[in-house]
Every structure is written in C-alpha cells, then in structure tokens.
Amino acid sequence: MSTMPEDIAAAQRLEQACQSLGLAAGAEQQEKLLRYMAQMQRWNRTYNLTAIRDPEQMLIQHLFDSLSVVQPLVRALQAGQPAKVYDVGSGGGLPGVVLAIVQPEWDITCVDAVEKKTAFVQQMAGTLMLPNLHAMHARIERVAPADCDVVISRAFASLHDFANLAGRHVRPGGTLVAMKGKVPAEEIEGLPAAWQVERIEPLQVPELDAERCLIWMRRSQGTL
C-alpha cells in the first residue's frame, strides 16, 4: 500500500516536534504514535472518543500536546528509571498512551469512567504491542489506592476535584500533575489544604499558539 503525501507530512512534522521538545523518540516509536492517531481517527467516527475530529488538529492538540509533558516528567522521575503512572480521566489515552509509547520503562494505567474509551486504550495496548500500558474502566474515587509515583490528568477536573478524587493514589513523596492551559489562579487558591502547588511549569507545544502549563502538586507538610 502506497504512503499518502499527508502521511509523509505528518511523519516529518512529528519528527520535527520531537526534536524541538528534546525527545529521542526512535523511528519505531514515532510510527506507533502516528498509528495511534490513525486508530483514534478511525474509532472516533463510531465511538466519539474526542470532540476534535480534524486530523490536523488531532496531531497538534492531542499528540504534540501530550508529547510536551514527556521531558518534564522524565526530569522529575529520573531518566531510565521504572515509574508507576496513572492517567486519570484519560479519555482515548491522552497523555497515557503517548507516555507508554515513548517511555517503555514506565508502567502506565489509563483510568476513565467511559467504557468505550478504556476499550480503545486496551485495544491500543495490543495493537501497538505496549505491555506497559493498561486500561481501567472505573471512577477514580472508587479505585483502591495505587501508590503511584505520578498521577496526571489532562482534561479531568478542577485542581480541587483532581486532588480530592485522585490524590490518594499518589505514594508518599509522589506528585499530582495537572495539564492546563492558562495558569488557573482561582483553582490554585481553591486547592484542599492537604495539597500545595510545588511549581508551575510553562509548556511550549509545537505548532500551537496557545498557553499551556503543568501544575505540579505535592502533599502539604504534615499530611499523609
């Protein structure tokens, strides 16, 4: 089967995005990332995994956006070390599937309350041969504490609800990480007392002219 020009262009743009983000993603990993996007487009026609349907915007707002958090997480978790990560409210696996592809030493679980979305993630674990990727159909507040190094969310809830519902899955010394657009000052002020913002890290998403940041949160001193 011949390769379409738009596929070649997407591959070139992905390679450039990885370079600009400082990611050493190999050819096989980049191919899996593009296959993941193609499968999301295909499933989206039937199962409505995401409101974004344009392939161009999916590449930027889903794939590149998710890739932008990899290096910050690598720095926090120490490169090459195993880590346990929960992606809460993962939807179709963003950023969890992307993390599983580019960081095979991390054990990634994508948690979502919508069964068709976790079914898609489970399918991707098999299709893309990702033994480190798992899907969990559940409400995060009903899941037994998981003792994670990082619990991350991209479009799950306010910081208050994220900390209240998912914070118990973070091991002592671990981190809650929220992917946000503009710095959510009001949400930060509304954080539960048990959690505090450690730092706010600006993100630069390739080809996206919009504000993005990571909110890093740890337990307040004296809390378990």
Swiss-Prot record:
UniProt KW keywords: Cytoplasm, Methyltransferase, rRNA processing, S-adenosyl-L-methionine, Transferase
Sample GO molecular function, one term: rRNA (guanine-N7-)-methyltransferase activity
Residues binding S-adenosyl-L-methionine, per UniProt: 89, 94, 140-141, 154
Cellular location(s): Cytoplasm
Catalytic activity: guanosine(527) in 16S rRNA + S-adenosyl-L-methionine = N(7)-methylguanosine(527) in 16S rRNA + S-adenosyl-L-homocysteine
GO CC terms, sorted: cytosol
E.C. designation(s): 2.1.1.170
Functional note: Specifically methylates the N7 position of guanine in position 527 of 16S rRNA.
Family stated for the protein in its record: Belongs to the methyltransferase superfamily. RNA methyltransferase RsmG family.
Protein name: Ribosomal RNA small subunit methyltransferase G
Organism of provenance: Bordetella avium (strain 197N)
